[in-house]
Amino acid sequence: MNVGNTPLIKLSDKLYGKYEALNPGGSIKDRPVKYILDVYERDGYLKKGDTIIEATSGNTGISLAMMCAERGYKCIIVMPSDMSEERKKMIDFFGAKIVLVEEGDFDGAIELKCNMAKQWGYVELNQFNNPLNVECHLNTTFIEILNDTYFDDVSAFIAGTGTGGTIMGVQQGFEKLRTDTKIIAVEPSESPVMSGGEKGLHGIQGIGDGSKFLVDLDK
């Protein structure tokens, strides 16, 4: 399955967007899911017939369900009940089992996922605190940005933030180059956790899940 190498599209004179919707699962989450599964398989952490479980607001669930179907793994997705029906249908289409928790309760989804994995011996993708998530974006997303900009000066990199994998990986890349590129994380105003506020319900699915441990911009 071909993931990544998405185009950098010119939006205005000095503004570009990376078109991650062209990934097979329709989002940037295809990158860390493929990367983590590749490493797990390489290191013997996975075998055919294993069950992989993850808590997600949807995009990672779609990516994981799709790749589990391709690779011969069973898949369980734990998610808040208020996530879009389209996401649920996509996950179901790929044959994954969906377990719902109360709307907006992302911490509850993560806790249930961990408990189920421990009780039944499921393999956790563990996107929220898996260093492979960050490593993936350092080794793929960041490198693609460099190649597409011909190593020219990048004034700022802006990304919506859920797990923090994208922005942390790209940040580490620019730090290695010792550039003064500004790294800007975007979160919903209704759930300004990174800004020191309280989590709340909002309408932007996929970012701003509200768990304070998901993002560490000091790394």
For the regions a protein language model found, what residue spans apply to each?
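PLP-dependent amino-acid enzyme catalytic core
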Residues: M1-K219
